[in-house]
């Protein structure tokens, strides 16, 4: 009885290892790093001089005649998603090869005439033909808006931005993540910028819920798919 128990333990461990190997591996995120950054604490305000009408500290330390475009860590920028890609690829291959060879013996000993009887004359020929074609195409469109936060300012003045939008509907949830580098001069007066003008753009759209589970193959099916040699 003790021997049976000892033998069952490795078998159960092997089955658990196989089941874990067939488990669904979550996809790696495209957007990495922080998705937001709070603004740094303001410096200690100095004593306000009496008689002054405009106080910079009362207006977020912005100059009087400057617009409120984002330029500091913690400011927000609205990204207008306008992504559209079209790609097509086609390939065709045609190859052929023919070959022939003739083998014969001009003279043979007379005592072997009845045995050979011109059987040494041989013709060899062969041919090889291969045809292959392939075609693929992709068409993707992604539109919408997402408001991001400035998480860093580069030495040349460009802004590092990142943001996330999560939407929960019934038992499912969806989220959009975005990160990239923006030139402040590309930001419009309404504090928006097109995603096509963002450098190093990372756009991620994922969903979790019943619809996502339906599109995923079961672990037992994945096991047989991995183990099958066909």
UniProtKB/Swiss-Prot annotation:
Transmembrane keyword on record: no
Region feature (Disordered): 34-53
Keywords linked to the UniProt accession: Bacterial flagellum, Cell outer membrane, Lipoprotein, Membrane, Palmitate, Signal
Biased composition (Pro residues): 36-46
Subcellular location: Cell outer membrane; Bacterial flagellum basal body
Chain segments annotated as coiled-coil in the UniProt record: none
Described function: Assembles around the rod to form the L-ring and probably protects the motor/basal body from shearing forces during rotation.
Protein name: Flagellar L-ring protein
Organism annotation: Bordetella bronchiseptica (strain ATCC BAA-588 / NCTC 13252 / RB50) (Alcaligenes bronchisepticus)
Gene name for this UniProt entry: flgH
């Amino acid at each position: 009885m003790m021997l049976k128990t000892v033998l069952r333990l490795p078998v159960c461990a092997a089955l658990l290892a196989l089941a874990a190997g067939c488990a669904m591996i979550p996809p790696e995120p495209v957007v990495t790093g922080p998705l937001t950054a709070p603004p740094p604490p303001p410096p200690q305000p100095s004593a306000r001089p009496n008689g002054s009408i405009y106080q910079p500290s009362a207006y977020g330390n912005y100059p009087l005649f400057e617009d409120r475009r984002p330029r500091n860590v913690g400011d927000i920028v609205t990204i207008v998603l306008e992504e559209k890609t079209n790609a097509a690829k086609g390939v065709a291959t045609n190859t052929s090869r023919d070959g022939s060879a003739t083998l014969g013996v001009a003279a043979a000993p007379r005592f072997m005439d009845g045995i050979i009887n011109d059987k040494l004359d041989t013709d060899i020929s062969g041919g090889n033909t291969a045809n292959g074609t392939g075609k693929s195409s992709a068409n993707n469109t992604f539109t919408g808006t997402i408001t991001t936060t400035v998480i860093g300012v580069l030495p040349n003045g460009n802004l590092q931005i990142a943001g996330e939008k999560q939407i929960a509907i019934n038992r499912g949830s969806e989220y959009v993540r975005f990160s990239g580098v923006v030139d402040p001069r590309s930001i419009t007066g309404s504090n928006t910028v097109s995603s096509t003008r963002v450098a190093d753009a990372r756009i991620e759209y994922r969903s979790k819920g019943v619809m996502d589970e339906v599109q995923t193959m079961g672990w037992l099916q994945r096991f047989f798919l991995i183990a099958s040699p066909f």
